[in-house]
Amino acid sequence: MTMLKTKADPMIVSMGPHHPSMHGVLRLIVTLDGENVIDCEPILGYLHRGMEKIAENRTTLQYLPYVTRWDYLATMFTEAVTVNAPERLANIQVPKRASYIRVIMLELSRLASHLLWLGPFMADIGAQTPFFYIFREREMIYDLFESATGMRMMHNYFRIGGVAVDLPYGWVDKCLDFCDYFLPKIDEYERLITRNPIFLKRVEGVGFIGREEAINWGLSGPMLRASGVQWDLRKVDHYECYDEFDWQVEWQTEGDCLARYLVRIGEMRESTKIIQQALKSIPGGPYENLEARRIGLIGTDSAQWNDFEYQFISKKPSPTFKLPKQEHYVRVEAPKGELGIYLIGDDSIFPWRWKIRPPGFINLQILPQLLRGVKLADIMTILGSIDIIMGEVDR
């Protein structure tokens, strides 16, 4: 452990795992010289539940309810990457309507996640008002989720080849009304926060990460884009139907806590624009595809409906859908960064390996370096700007 030189005997303080601003069961062993942080050691694992091992003896449909417990504030993204992996592996086509519904749900989930980042982050640095404001909008998003999926959180809505149920009657109009209501609220947050002199004193120049440093540490999401890297998997990987909408990648060059705040505020605007475009141009047709065509078989490119190799995916968890003997890495742009799954099929109904790449775990690695030399009060600002959820960090 490298430590800065100190004037006096250092004091070692344990923050967490139940400190109110620790954002979950994270423990920081902080070495202090007065109010200056000499060193910090994060202790993880308090929320480890063996999610990767559980996946190895569950079918994909049986595993779907588990994945919503990784990042429990952005559950649509964990579901999306969980169904995208077998879809890519078995070459399953997703109907256009299902793809649009997925994009709408993903962006609503991004809004809910960013809102619940903004409130506690502001509370961490001493501003209580936004903490109460964000729940007003978040409640409306959860009402939309509840009417479409039946659940406010842990939706269990995505399925291999589409979604579980179609959007209910009147849902599109209700969601458009929410978008019209929400855009002025983002302006209200900005008027309240962005140019506030006390807020700027707390975040400007704090927790600086340079461009090369961010790339070398493997950061992703707003952490990477706030350091001057225009990298968004929705533009890079062209998954779902994001290419059909007009939107911009939000990024900043400063690399401090203020830049990370501005990126997330900008992303809320862009997400609302994507939702509005998707709702206005959503096509008709089926919302699911229950056909699985096997690929990679000797002598066949893809199985036809009357071939022996043709497979039907049941809506219930059943052993009819086998994962081909291949491996694949699938990723989505979650609110916190790149959420990826490395899936190895073994010609079995169970995956041979299900490796999770959580964004929070990777982004948290840089925390000790950011905290060395700062004041004790800045720990909460820097940790809050990273935006971690311990469910996905510990898995």
From Swiss-Prot:
| Gene3D superfamilies the UniProt entry points to | Cytochrome-c3 Hydrogenase, chain B (1.10.645.10)
One Pfam entry for this protein is Complex1_49kDa
Q: Which reaction does it catalyse?
A: a plastoquinone + NADH + (n+1) H(+)(in) = a plastoquinol + NAD(+) + n H(+)(out); a plastoquinone + NADPH + (n+1) H(+)(in) = a plastoquinol + NADP(+) + n H(+)(out)
Question: Cellular location of this protein?
Answer: Plastid, Chloroplast thylakoid membrane
Enzyme Commission designation: 7.1.1.-
* Molecular function in Gene Ontology: NAD binding; oxidoreductase activity, acting on NAD(P)H, quinone or similar compound as acceptor; quinone binding
Which keywords describe this protein according to UniProt?
Chloroplast, Membrane, NAD, NADP, Plastid, Plastoquinone, Quinone, Thylakoid, Translocase, Transport
Membrane spanning segments where?
none
Q: What is its main location?
A: plastid
Might you name a Gene Ontology BP term for this protein?
Answer: photosynthesis, light reaction
Its function, per the record, reads: NDH shuttles electrons from NAD(P)H:plastoquinone, via FMN and iron-sulfur (Fe-S) centers, to quinones in the photosynthetic chain and possibly in a chloroplast respiratory chain. The immediate electron acceptor for the enzyme in this species is believed to be plastoquinone. Couples the redox reaction to proton translocation, and thus conserves the redox energy in a proton gradient.
Assembly behavior: NDH is composed of at least 16 different subunits, 5 of which are encoded in the nucleus.
Entry's family note: Belongs to the complex I 49 kDa subunit family.
Protein name (database record): NAD(P)H-quinone oxidoreductase subunit H, chloroplastic
Q: Which gene encodes it?
A: ndhH
